[in-house]
């Protein structure tokens, strides 16, 4: 008998563990207790990745049920999730709001950024609280990536995961995108691998060098040049041991003192 098609593969579980999606925080909201697998000796709570996978499947079904993909709004005020929501919007046709959420975007129709979405997805309920609050005023269902200490008020579907790590946030958004495309039929078979790698959803520091190997080679080359210059200078100094060092041009004999008693007194102004 074949396994259910919606069950996670060993590769999916390995990816979740490698991205540290199961690492929670030391505090737990009472609503998030069912998602906690156990608590480590240092007080950090471990999230059950099985619950994470179930909620990813549920969220993907809800997203795929929206007829117009543009009516799904993905929001991330947290820096680590901004790249992920932009890629999710690109692959699934949703609307992305990366960065600061303009207050009144869901409630004030006079503003230019006014939207009437049918579904809202947020990266962190704590940083995206303004969007969740406005969604509750206009009856918009909310899907949120929640940690063990995240508030879940006005959140309809909570995906338990580590929403503070760049790899964890990117991987969860990547899995949601993949499952949505599978349900829509964009991917031929569930056994077919998606050509998009999870690394594309990970946050990248703009100041970080693009290729670490090239940066390491440049650093090694500079070190070799500096070492050769130091050795050449040491060899030059070793050949001139017989030459006495030159005295400084501005050097003076501070030990010698003058007899001030013999000096003429300064003239006194009348």
From Swiss-Prot:
Chain intervals with Acidic residues compositional bias: 207-225
Compositional bias per record (Low complexity), positions renumbered to this chain: 226-258
Keyword Ribonucleoprotein in annotation: yes
Pfam families per record: Ribosomal_S2
GO cellular component: cytosolic small ribosomal subunit
The organism's place on the tree of life at top rank: Eukaryota
Region: Disordered, residue numbers: 207-270
GO molecular function: structural constituent of ribosome
Assigned keywords, A-Z: Cytoplasm, Ribonucleoprotein, Ribosomal protein
SUPFAM superfamilies: Ribosomal protein S2
GO biological process: cytoplasmic translation; ribosomal small subunit assembly
CDD domains for the chain: RPS2
Annotated localization: Cytoplasm
Quaternary organization: Component of the small ribosomal subunit. Mature ribosomes consist of a small (40S) and a large (60S) subunit. The 40S subunit contains about 33 different proteins and 1 molecule of RNA (18S). The 60S subunit contains about 49 different proteins and 3 molecules of RNA (25S, 5.8S and 5S). Interacts with RPS21.
Family indicated by similarity: Belongs to the universal ribosomal protein uS2 family.
Function (record text): Required for the assembly and/or stability of the 40S ribosomal subunit. Required for the processing of the 20S rRNA-precursor to mature 18S rRNA in a late step of the maturation of 40S ribosomal subunits.
Name this polypeptide is given: Small ribosomal subunit protein uS2
Organism annotation: Yarrowia lipolytica (strain CLIB 122 / E 150) (Yeast)
């Amino acid at each position: 008998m074949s396994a259910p098609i919606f069950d996670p593969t060993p590769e999916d579980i390995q990816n979740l563990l490698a991205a540290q999606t199961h690492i929670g925080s030391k505090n737990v909201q009472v609503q998030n207790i069912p998602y906690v697998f156990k608590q480590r000796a240092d007080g950090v709570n471990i999230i059950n990745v099985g619950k994470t996978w179930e909620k990813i499947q549920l969220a993907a079904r809800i997203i795929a049920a929206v007829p117009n993909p543009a009516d799904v709004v993905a929001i991330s005020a947290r820096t680590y999730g901004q790249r992920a929501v932009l890629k999710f919007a690109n692959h699934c046709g949703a609307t992305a709001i990366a960065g600061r959420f303009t207050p009144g975007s869901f409630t004030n129709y006079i503003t230019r950024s006014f939207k009437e979405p049918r579904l809202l997805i947020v990266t962190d309920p704590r940083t995206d609280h303004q969007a969740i609050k406005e969604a509750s005023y206009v009856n918009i269902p909310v899907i949120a990536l929640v940690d063990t200490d995240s508030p879940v008020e006005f959140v309809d579907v909570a995906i338990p995961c580590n929403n503070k790590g760049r790899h964890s946030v990117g991987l969860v958004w990547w899995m949601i995108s993949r499952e949505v495309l599978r349900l829509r039929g964009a991917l031929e078979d569930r056994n077919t691998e998606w050509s998009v790698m999870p690394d594309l959803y990970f946050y990248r520091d703009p100041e970080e060098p693009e290729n670490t190997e090239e940066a390491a080679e440049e650093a090694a080359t500079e070190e070799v040049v500096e070492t050769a210059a130091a050795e050449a200078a040491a060899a030059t100094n070793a050949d001139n041991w017989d030459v006495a060092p030159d005295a400084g041009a501005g050097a003076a004999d501070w030990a010698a003192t003058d007899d001030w008693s013999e000096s003429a007194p300064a003239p006194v102004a009348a």
